[in-house]
């Protein structure tokens, strides 16, 4: 199982209606994307981020389905223009030592084939973590597991 999560701050210029539309789009992803087994979307407490979401996805094939599903693309198009700071992460019980690279490759393939999404991501104030484009500074931390 892969738990794909993100945490983000909202720009001061975003209206409450825009924010709710983006959050509802995130919730809709969880409801309609077949590979999502469970999800949570809501306020992020205890840190510098305003909101977060976590989606439980069975495997890499399901992860790709999630990334390119129209519901996810809608969230990107509706939500990313409202976001200032974005951080993504993936937690998995899969012991494949290449899992981080495989996840990064899926995200990069999406950026390579969807220029409008890549442009939206490039306009974020800050983007770090497992889903960040390779060109983003500090996008992929070293694997913390012992060799």
Language-model features: locations:
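Short S/T/G/P-rich N-terminal loop/turn motif that feeds into the first structured element of a domain
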Residues: 1-50, 60-65, 84-147
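Sensory beta-strand/linker motifs that couple input domains to effectors
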Residues: 56
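Mid-chain, well-packed structural core segment of small domains
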Residues: 60-79
């Amino acid at each position: 199982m892969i738990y794909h999560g993100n945490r983000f701050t909202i720009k001061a210029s975003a209206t409450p209606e825009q924010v709710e539309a983006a959050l509802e789009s995130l919730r809709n992803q969880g409801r309609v994307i077949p590979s999502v087994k469970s999800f949570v979307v809501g306020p992020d407490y205890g840190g510098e981020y305003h909101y977060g979401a976590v989606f439980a996805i069975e495997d890499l094939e399901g992860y790709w389905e999630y990334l390119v599903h129209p519901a996810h693309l809608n969230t990107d198009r509706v939500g990313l223009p409202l976001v200032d700071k974005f951080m993504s992460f993936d937690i998995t019980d899969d012991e494949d030592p290449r899992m981080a690279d495989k996840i990064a490759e899926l995200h990069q393939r999406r950026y390579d084939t969807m220029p409008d999404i890549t442009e939206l991501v490039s306009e974020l104030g800050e983007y770090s973590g497992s889903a960040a484009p390779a060109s983003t500074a500090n996008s992929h931390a070293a694997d913390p597991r012992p060799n």
